[in-house]
């Protein structure tokens, strides 16, 4: 039988180096530093500073921006444990500054630090630390050694933060959303961002909704351009783009992305990207169901599938065009 020898905890010097000279009271006690010594060292003119409740800076100089973030994270994460660095993530504008977003102030100018913790944690705001609670499982990404919320969540919390501060606060909404999905290190997908903004209830804010709609439309336009190239390669006739289909009596049916009236074939591209609310999703699904009920053959194409298996999408499109719709009801096309 083999035995695993437990790894000894890092010394105070090693811990201070890892956490940029910021430590908690429990970490100090675990290394033999009594409360009396901590109090003495933090007196005026002493070698240490108390930054937040139970969080100390092992230097007499003021904290750097990074040390302020370490203090915020350790304050929110500790739970009476010696190595309490889990259970909290930095989010909002502070996280975006760590990620390097150009549209938000740099770290020295960030005046508040939002920290996300589980809903059941009993923790109060302290100093510049604002506690945000979530009922979802925390997901952390290490950025310069600090636990940060994923980009989509950090963006949503930053927008909530700016919205709560009032209408007079400048909100670089469009710039932040664009940067979230367009940076070379693949910040997040448009779908992830849309889902997070919807979950946070931000899509009812006009500026957020307008910027999100712009992103969604751009994503779909990109995929539609690729589909157009595929249609040309398959030697298919040029389809109608975004026509409004109605019954002879004027009853609305749907607005497919592409439609070949001579074959009764419609194509829908990433239809979920047309929808932010459940009501919009129901409207789109209703149109698709009506087309299928009336005999139109509907081909569904996603950008991910088109990128991964372009030949298979082309084969499906050619087959659909060859077979055509089934007993298609005569429709008016606007």
What residue ranges belong to the model's regions?
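Surface segments flanking catalytic/ligand-binding clefts of nucleic-acid enzymes
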Residues: 2-7, 34-37, 181-334
């Amino acid at each position: 039988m083999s035995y695993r020898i437990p790894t000894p905890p890092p010394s105070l010097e090693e811990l201070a180096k890892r956490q940029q000279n910021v430590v908690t009271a429990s970490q100090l006690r675990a290394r033999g530093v009594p409360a009396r010594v901590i109090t003495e060292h933090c007196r005026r003119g002493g070698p240490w500073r108390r930054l937040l409740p139970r969080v100390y800076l092992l230097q007499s100089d003021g904290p750097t921006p990074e040390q302020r973030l370490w203090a915020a994270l350790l304050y929110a994460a500790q739970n009476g444990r010696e190595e309490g660095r889990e259970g909290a993530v930095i989010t909002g504008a502070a996280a975006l500054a760590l990620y390097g977003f150009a549209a938000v102030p740099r770290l020295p100018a960030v005046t508040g630090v939002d920290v996300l913790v589980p809903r059941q944690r009993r923790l109060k705001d302290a100093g510049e630390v604002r506690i945000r609670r979530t009922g979802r499982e925390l997901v952390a990404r290490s950025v310069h050694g600090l636990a940060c919320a994923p980009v989509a969540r950090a963006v949503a919390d930053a927008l909530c933060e700016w919205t709560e501060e009032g209408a007079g606060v400048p909100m670089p909404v469009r710039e932040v959303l664009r940067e979230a999905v367009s940076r070379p290190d693949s910040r997040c997908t448009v779908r992830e961002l849309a889902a997070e903004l919807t979950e946070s209830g931000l899509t009812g804010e006009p500026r957020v909704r307008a910027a999100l709609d712009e992103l969604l439309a751009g994503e779909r336009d990109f995929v539609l351009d690729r589909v157009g190239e595929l249609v040309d390669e398959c030697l298919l006739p040029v389809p109608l783009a975004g026509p409004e289909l109605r019954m002879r009596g004027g009853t609305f049916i749907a607005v497919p992305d592409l439609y070949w009236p001579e074959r009764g074939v419609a194509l829908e591209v990433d239809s979920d990207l047309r929808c932010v609310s459940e009501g919009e999703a129901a409207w789109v699904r209703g149109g698709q169901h009506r087309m299928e009920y009336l005999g139109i053959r509907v081909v569904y194409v996603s950008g991910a599938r088109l990128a991964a298996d372009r030949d298979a999408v082309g084969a499906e499109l050619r087959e659909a065009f060859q077979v055509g719709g089934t007993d298609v009801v005569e429709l008016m096309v606007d």
